[in-house]
Amino acid sequence: MKTPHKKATARQQTREIVDDHTLSASMRKKKISQKKQRGRPSSQTRRNIVGCRISHGWKEGDEPITQWKGTVLDQVPINPSLYLVKYDGIDCVYGLELHRDKRILKLKILPDKVPFSRVRDVHLANTIIGKAVEHMFEGEHGSKDGWRGMVLAQAPIMKAWFYITYEKDPVLYMYQLLDDYKEGDLHIMPESSKSSPKEREPEGVIDGLIGKHVEYTKEDGSKRTGKVIHQVKAKPSVYFIKFDDDFHIYVYDLVKKS
């Protein structure tokens, strides 16, 4: 895993996958594949690590081993081997099969506790969730750069943090957004008069996308595959997608109107 630079610098390195590419609208039904036939390690004897602090090495190809520490935020229900992890000093959330990924070396459960945190301003927290925002970051020369995005949810375990994604970089990030709001670095965008809650698609249809495989067509015509792993409660048309060849969690609106 390469360490992305924090704040505005990270966003200047926008991933190739988000550069004017189109997410294929076609959804393929989950197939009974070889993955389903593989023997799975027994989860009954394995400790629940959600909420735990972890450390491990990371070895990819010929690159030197790097050491990582972080907090396990969640276990994905449709793929219990997949965990969402917030690593120390990293702003984005990673999705990794901690017990299966061969690049992960010497996984350890650390004795240190996750610091207890709670939201002091519940009203403000409820106000920003689901809202379009402009998030200000300090640029290279001290200038302020605004990044438009959406606040998705309060993060699990680390309750003072919030999930957020950006138009220019649609992967899952998490920040202490209430602090940013009070410091004037997070602005709620005015809602469009054209939008209406009544325009949402039927929830039953939307729920049916969870667990489905998706195909992503890049600008050069090449494709990558992944799976829809989560639906955003505050914005039911928005989903988390985990691609097979990437440990980032991507965030897309899968039922946008043409």
From Swiss-Prot:
Keywords: Cell cycle, Nucleus. Residues 210-255 are annotated as: Tudor-like domain 3. Residues 138, 246-248 are annotated as: Histone H3K4me3 and H3R8me2a binding. It is found in: Nucleus. Residues 129-178 are annotated as: Tudor-like domain 2. Residues 1-47 are annotated as: Disordered. Belongs to the SPIN/STSY family. May be involved in the regulation of cell cycle progression. Exhibits H3K4me3-binding activity. This is Spindlin-2. The lineage of its organism: Eukaryota, Metazoa, Chordata, Craniata, Vertebrata. The gene is SPIN2.
